[in-house]
Amino acid sequence: MKHIARKRFGQHFLSDAAVVDAIVGLIDPRPGQALVEIGPGLGAMTDPLVARCEHLTVVELDRDLAARLRRRAELQVIESDVLRVDFAALAMASAGRLRIVGNLPYNISTPILFHLLPAAAQVEDQHFMLQKEVVERMAAAPCSKDYGRLSVMLQWRYDIESVLDVPPEAFEPPPRVNSAVVRMLPFPAPPAVDAALLGELVATAFSQRRKLLRHTLGKWLDAREFSGTFDTQRRAEEVPVADYLALALALTPGER
């Protein structure tokens, strides 16, 4: 029986063989690597990945698709919402750093990216199909319209590169947006800032992105009795990632 894509799961199945081959080539999986695929769907990428790495862990929420996948001995199937999966624990169980791949559901792609942040130290790399607009925001530089909270939080932990553009017709059903594949390489020694603190800082800064930071972040810093130096005569989009990280470190107890 043909599986019908379910809108509530944000399902758009990759169906272009040439695109699949290009993505798998970019990933370059090898036997013995701890590969995890998020949202394998009908297996368009699963099949060529398994052919090259021999064993694969897949995370699939759709009950019917998970049942199909369980028929294959070379797959370890985790039937779960990806936002409930402990990737750090999965890495420990795999006795090696994870290589995470997937055609992510576009309706929850940003929450998935944030969910993966705490496990970055246990990850070798990540390759994801995403809405092209999201990839542009992830990789955006300061002083650009796409630069924002997502850019800062992800560029703290990863080197980010858009590696392949994918048109809507490569999917079934085709999404209404253009897509792109992003490569994310975790930095080996990122600044040791508190993730919650940095997240609050950046969210406050970008809460009114067109205003000078003295109207938003300035008040937030005053409430924390910050006595250091930080130029609030800038807009949030003008502040480099390194400056946000330095401020978060200065606000961390014991780092002042």
UniProtKB/Swiss-Prot annotation:
S-adenosyl-L-methionine binds at residues 12, 14, 39, 60, 81, 103. It is found in: Cytoplasm. It holds the Pfam family RrnaAD. It catalyses: adenosine(1518)/adenosine(1519) in 16S rRNA + 4 S-adenosyl-L-methionine = N(6)-dimethyladenosine(1518)/N(6)-dimethyladenosine(1519) in 16S rRNA + 4 S-adenosyl-L-homocysteine + 4 H(+). It comes from the Bacteria. The keyword DNA-binding does not apply. InterPro entries: KsgA/Erm, rRNA_Ade_diMease-like_C, rRNA_Ade_Mease_Trfase_CS, rRNA_Ade_methylase_Trfase_N, rRNA_adenine_dimethylase, SAM-dependent_MTases_sf. Its EC number is 2.1.1.182. It is an enzyme of class 2 (transferase). Its main location: cytoplasm. Keywords: Cytoplasm, Methyltransferase, RNA-binding, rRNA processing, S-adenosyl-L-methionine, Transferase. One of its GO terms (molecular function) is 16S rRNA (adenine(1518)-N(6)/adenine(1519)-N(6))-dimethyltransferase activity. Belongs to the class I-like SAM-binding methyltransferase superfamily. rRNA adenine N(6)-methyltransferase family. RsmA subfamily. Specifically dimethylates two adjacent adenosines (A1518 and A1519) in the loop of a conserved hairpin near the 3'-end of 16S rRNA in the 30S particle. May play a critical role in biogenesis of 30S subunits. PANTHER family: DIMETHYLADENOSINE TRANSFERASE, DIMETHYLADENOSINE TRANSFERASE-RELATED. This is Ribosomal RNA small subunit methyltransferase A. It comes from Methylibium petroleiphilum (strain ATCC BAA-1232 / LMG 22953 / PM1). The gene is rsmA.
